[in-house]
Amino acid sequence: MIELIPAIDIIDGKCVRLSQGDYGSKKVYNENPVEVAKEFEANGIRRLHVVDLDGAASHHVVNYRTLDLISSRTSLIIDFGGGLKSDEDLIIAFENGAQMVTGGSIAVRNPDLFCRWIDRYGSGKIILGADVKDRRIAVNGWKDESTCELFPFLKDYTQKGIEKVICTDISCDGMLAGPSLDLYKEILAEHPTLYLIASGGVSSIADIEALHEAGVPAVIFGKALYEGRITLKELQAFL
């Protein structure tokens, strides 16, 4: 069964969503992310994707207190991303309750450091973030496009020990227009043992069913849940 991973994106300690990574499109859904996390947990959700959007823009972890509150008041398994640029950032994330961390920009800008994290903490704790725009990896809170192409990027890091990848098609994220099924099928055809976590575009329970049928191991979703297009009750079929 596909693993369900709701997302809580944080700006100024509040639960927000963006469209295509545009900070100007910010919409606040709840002033208290802990309330959101507790509601997820009460409905059978076991894992959470927490993104520090302030951190992603500032190049260092910012909303670690919110991470600590969520982790201390729920039993959710949390993977945390946004602003992880140094050993200190990683320690802050783990000390404040993250069980896993996701590195995207760092894997492009400082691959030596990212590989040290893989070696030190193991592939169970370090997730590769592959945020894609026109098949190239985007960095710095999606504001910049790198020269890294997706498939060589994935091949390189799977050879270095990465086993889990969150792949977000930026053109889909927050648009409620459906996920990039063909892209995910292509990735799994090339990397059949990869724990691929699809992210971006989920608009309905049918999208989750389609990802499940395509063999995608896990899915991150947010706006569809916050906008009421998917209900927590509907998700019970996958739990």
From Swiss-Prot:
Pfam families: His_biosynth
Keyword Oxidoreductase: no
InterPro entries assigned: Aldolase_TIM, His_biosynth, HisA_bact_arch, Isoase_HisA-like, Isoase_HisA-like_bact, RibuloseP-bd_barrel
GO MF annotation terms: 1-(5-phosphoribosyl)-5-[(5-phosphoribosylamino)methylideneamino]imidazole-4-carboxamide isomerase activity
GO cellular component entries: cytoplasm
Residues at the active site: 9, 131
GO biological process: L-histidine biosynthetic process; L-tryptophan biosynthetic process
PANTHER family cross-referenced by the UniProt entry: 1-(5-PHOSPHORIBOSYL)-5-[(5-PHOSPHORIBOSYLAMINO)METHYLIDENEAMINO] IMIDAZOLE-4-CARBOXAMIDE ISOMERASE
Name used for this protein in its record: 1-(5-phosphoribosyl)-5-[(5-phosphoribosylamino)methylideneamino] imidazole-4-carboxamide isomerase
Organism of this sequence: Bacteroides fragilis (strain ATCC 25285 / DSM 2151 / CCUG 4856 / JCM 11019 / LMG 10263 / NCTC 9343 / Onslow / VPI 2553 / EN-2)
